Amino acid sequence: MIKTFLGAFAALSLSFSAFSAMKIDAPAPGFTLTNSNGDVVSLSDYEGKHVVLEWTNHLCPYVKKHYESDNMQKLQRKFGAQEVVWLSIISSAPGKQGYVDATEANQLTEERNAQPSHVLFDPDGHVGKLYSAKTTPHMYIIDPQGVLKYAGGIDSIKSANPADIPKAQNYVDIGLNALLSGQSIDKKLTPPYGCSIKYKS
């Protein structure tokens, strides 16, 4: 009984620790993942640049809201032109909603005219848990010094209705504009909204 309790406590502690690594205004957790072209990509590759992390699941209605309206792509294009690195991360486990292979990921990028710097695969969910990523979309901004400056929702209206996009405050747009202008972000941590990430059980 005691061993069972201690084992459960250890598992709970590990889970809590994994989901508590992310802290605003602290160094962003480093990671290395494979992209949809089979290349190895590390966060450290982009030291000196602003980086956006976007957790995504193409079947999620909340993700569809921002892609079918071209809202996400507009952000990718706007800030890509300003040398911001955009990393779209798929943490759906094999066999679960949102999981795709490399060919499917590249097809989705082409079909949606998306402009991420890379689409990255996190099938065991370890990077998602490092960042306490809970939903799709869940957005993060990292500054050129590698410090996490924003984590949360893409905007202020928690709905899957594209009609709400023009009425919402886009936290990613506001945050990146501030950082690129040498200013600080006012809202550094906001509640994410969307579909739960389909992590490996």
Question: What annotation goes with each model-predicted range?
Answer:
Residues K49-H50, K65-I89, E110:
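Conserved helix-turn-beta segment immediately C-terminal to the redox Cys motif
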Residues S15-A18:
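N-terminal signal peptide c-region/cleavage motif recognized by signal peptidases
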Residues I2-A11:
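Sec-dependent signal peptide recognition
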